């Protein structure tokens, strides 16, 4: 049981209060200009929150069978007290981000030191524009994934040090909750699994013990060996499909297509987890019978965290989509990734892909800090979970088929918190050799991120188009219209659903809007460009 230390607890509370206050104060200028980087995807979340107050209780984002939306319930509570607005909507994500920053501070302080925790926190607060954007986006999956992943890692660390079953159950519930929110949590699962293996004393002997499984009943040893063999076969087939782009084979006169590497690897991962999990469970419970109850409780906690998704799938079916990529596709993606995605994540391009004009030579301190942090792994046996995360995330991103265009950078954003820690560790490693160089690296990185934020803020222009269109629609007495996806839901939210604008392309996320628009044959179609729009509605292109 945890012993209470009132001075230490009071000091920690004050630290977290200061951190949360800094997050809110430094993000405030961007929050108050939130309409300048508010899009239709975010508007969907706001509309969902409004509908929660009307008795609708969604589990997933409208139009999807994945991407959980716990944030819309928080937004609904805010709307109930403060009314619906862009600022109110984005403030929910900001509050979740502040909680994440506080939680990661606690984790980093436990794993490393207070100094490193403060530096990592500074890099999160004064971070690149891509991080600022997602820390204020109503699509809160990035922030909630980082929050769930950090809670999972913190719970495992507390359990590892103290044996607290409550901490282990918290980690399990966070893992399930994160999976409901988004598949991004897999990044954290992989990194944590590698870190646990890294933590293990005599890990080579332990892994050999699991592979040999001499303590497992013979029938189960053979069964799990067959399952593991099947997993290996699927891995091989997936690799072949990935390298060749896919092919057909004939087995016993039946044509079999081997084309989707990612689907084959998913099957392999499931089989391998099943086989390894069975062996580990039996070996551990044989030596510690009480571990069985903890395993059952942890599984129950995971299910509880993932329960909304399980219930929705049980009622309506569906499954998350699986990306597809092969070696040729990955090779073709390298150039746009280096040209667009890397500069966006690093902060030299804005989230909308425009260059910010910040000198590229300022990238040198972060690069040196990352290298110093990686080299420090060989000199000091600290926990490499954050290093694993920034290495495995891009690899998974590449081979999973997640890349589509420059905006696919969002799939890399869950590693932003870990990157801040790696940069802090690098600055500290440099500081250990030269205080001047270490302090200089830290200051230069903060200056870089500050310049990037300032440049992006200067590029944010008022949303003149949306307000002008709304004024025109009001003057013309229009209450139903159609428009491009990226305009439709945004206008509907900004008008508080006084005007219903349904998309005539892209994803129809909420069919009742489209039904209401189609019920009015005179509903105009709003052109994509403001220069084409007249306050007198043109019904010639009505739906």
Please annotate each region the language model reported.
Residues 103, 123, 143-175, 193, ...:
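Specific aromatic-rich, kink-prone transmembrane helix
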Residues 91-112, 131, 148-155, 372-373:
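Transmembrane-helix motifs of polytopic, lipid-linked glycan transferases
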Residues 13-19, 104-128, 146-147, 161-166, ...:
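Transmembrane-helix signature of polytopic, membrane-embedded enzymes
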Residues 187, 255-269, 357-366, 383-432:
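Hydrophobic/aromatic-rich transmembrane helices and adjacent perimembrane loops
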Residues 30-40, 53-88:
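Membrane-proximal lumenal/periplasmic loop motifs of glycosylation machinery
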Residues 5, 52, 149-171, 178, ...:
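Membrane-interface transmembrane helices that cradle and orient dolichyl/undecaprenyl
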Residues 196-197, 203, 215-218, 269-283, ...:
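Hydrophobic, aromatic-rich transmembrane alpha-helices
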């Amino acid at each position: 049981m945890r012993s209470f230390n009132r001075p230490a607890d009071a000091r920690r509370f004050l630290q977290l209060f200061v951190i949360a206050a800094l997050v809110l104060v430094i993000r405030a200028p961007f929050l108050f200009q939130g309409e300048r980087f508010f899009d239709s995807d975010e508007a969907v979340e706001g509309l969902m929150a409004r509908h929660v107050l009307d008795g609708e209780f969604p589990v997933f984002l409208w139009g999807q069978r994945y991407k959980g939306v716990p944030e819309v319930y928080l937004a609904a509570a805010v709307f109930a007290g403060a009314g619906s607005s862009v600022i109110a909507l984005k403030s929910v994500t900001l509050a979740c981000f502040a909680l994440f920053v506080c939680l990661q501070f606690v984790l980093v302080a436990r794993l490393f030191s207070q100094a490193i925790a403060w530096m990592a926190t500074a890099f999160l607060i004064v971070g690149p524009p891509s991080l600022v954007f997602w820390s204020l986006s109503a699509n809160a999956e990035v922030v909630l994934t980082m929050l769930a992943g950090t809670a999972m890692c913190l719970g495992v660390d507390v359990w590892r040090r103290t044996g607290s079953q409550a901490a282990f159950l918290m980690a399990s519930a966070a893992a399930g909750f994160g999976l409901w929110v988004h598949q991004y949590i897999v990044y954290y699962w992989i990194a944590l699994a590698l870190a646990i293996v890294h933590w293990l004393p005599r890990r080579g002997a332990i892994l050999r013990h699991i592979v040999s499984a001499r303590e497992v009943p013979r029938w189960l040893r053979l069964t799990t060996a067959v399952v593991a063999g099947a997993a290996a076969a699927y891995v091989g087939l997936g690799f072949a499909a990935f390298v060749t782009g896919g092919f057909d084979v004939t087995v016993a006169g039946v044509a079999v297509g081997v084309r989707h590497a990612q689907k084959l690897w998913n099957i392999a991962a499931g089989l391998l987890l099943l086989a390894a999990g069975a062996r580990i469970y039996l070996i551990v419970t044989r030596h510690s019978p009480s571990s069985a109850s903890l395993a059952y409780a942890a599984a129950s906690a995971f299910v509880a965290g993932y329960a909304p998704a399980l219930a929705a799938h049980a009622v309506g079916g569906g499954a998350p989509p699986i990306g597809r990529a092969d070696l040729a596709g990955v090779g073709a993606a390298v150039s746009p990734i280096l040209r667009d995605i890397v500069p966006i994540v690093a902060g030299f391009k804005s989230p909308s892909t425009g260059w910010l004009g910040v000198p590229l030579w300022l990238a040198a301190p972060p690069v040196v800090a990352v290298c110093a942090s990686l080299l420090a792994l060989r000199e000091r046996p600290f926990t490499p979970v954050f290093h694993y995360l920034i290495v495995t995330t891009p690899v998974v991103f590449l081979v999973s088929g997640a890349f589509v265009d420059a905006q696919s950078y969002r799939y890399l954003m869950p590693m932003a918190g870990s990157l801040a820690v790696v940069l802090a560790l690098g600055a500290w490693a440099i500081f250990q050799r030269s205080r001047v160089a270490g302090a200089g690296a830290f200051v230069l990185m903060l200056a870089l991120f500050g310049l990037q934020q300032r440049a992006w803020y200067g590029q944010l222009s008022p949303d003149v188009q949306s307000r002008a269109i709304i004024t025109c629609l009001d003057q013309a007495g229009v209450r139903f219209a159609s428009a491009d996806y990226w305009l439709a839901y945004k206008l509907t939210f900004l008008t508080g659903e006084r005007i219903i604008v349904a998309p005539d392309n892209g994803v129809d996320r909420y069919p009742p809007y489209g039904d209401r628009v189609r019920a009015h044959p005179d509903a105009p179609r709003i052109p994509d460009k403001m220069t084409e729009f007249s306050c007198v509605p043109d019904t010639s292109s009505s739906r």
